[in-house]
Swiss-Prot record:
Upper taxonomic lineage: Bacteria, Bacillati, Actinomycetota, Actinomycetes, Mycobacteriales
Source organism of this protein record: Nocardia farcinica (strain IFM 10152)
Protein family: Belongs to the universal ribosomal protein uS13 family.
GO biological process terms on file: translation
SUPFAM superfamilies (UniProt xref): S13-like H2TH domain
Record-level Gene Ontology MF annotations: rRNA binding; structural constituent of ribosome; tRNA binding
Pfam families found in the cross-reference section: Ribosomal_S13 (PF00416)
Cleaved signal peptide residues: none
Gene this chain is encoded by: rpsM
UniProt-recorded name of the protein: Small ribosomal subunit protein uS13
Function noted in UniProt: Located at the top of the head of the 30S subunit, it contacts several helices of the 16S rRNA. In the 70S ribosome it contacts the 23S rRNA (bridge B1a) and protein L5 of the 50S subunit (bridge B1b), connecting the 2 subunits; these bridges are implicated in subunit movement. Contacts the tRNAs in the A and P-sites.
Length: 123
């Protein structure tokens, strides 16, 4: 099994898709990486040679973009900073509500968690 940046790449997927399993790499960046390293996007990750794997690893580490742990730490630090300075987005993060202006009268169940039933008015 091919292991890259601390992530096990799925064996049966094409490299173009398999690279997207690394946090911080999407389809566009995956194509860019494969083009720069000369690895075929149609190659399955199980058929990847050690030389190809080394080329991919070196290119990702040498590139300016952050992936995996570094990117996760940066995102968490940004959220922590917003909470500390007390901006609106920080307050929304602290309360566990949607941050980007979505409605909350209905929906937002993923962010708010399961419904808390409130007793109805008795007649």
């Amino acid at each position: 099994m091919a292991r890259l940046m601390g992530v096990d790449l799925p064996r049966e997927k094409r490299m173009e898709i398999a690279l997207t399993y690394i946090y911080g790499i999407g389809r566009t960046r995956s194509k860019e990486i494969l083009e720069a390293t000369g690895v075929s996007p149609d190659l399955r990750s199980k058929d990847l040679s050690d030389d190809d794997l080394t080329k991919l690893r070196d290119y990702i580490e040498a590139s300016e973009f952050k992936v995996e742990g570094d990117l996760r730490r940066e995102v968490q630090a940004d959220i922590r900073r917003k909470i500390e300075i007390g901006c609106y987005q920080g307050l929304r993060h602290r309360r566990g509500l949607p941050v980007r202006g979505q409605r909350t009268k209905t929906n937002a169940r993923t962010r708010k968690g399961p419904k808390k039933t409130v007793a109805g008015k008795k007649k």
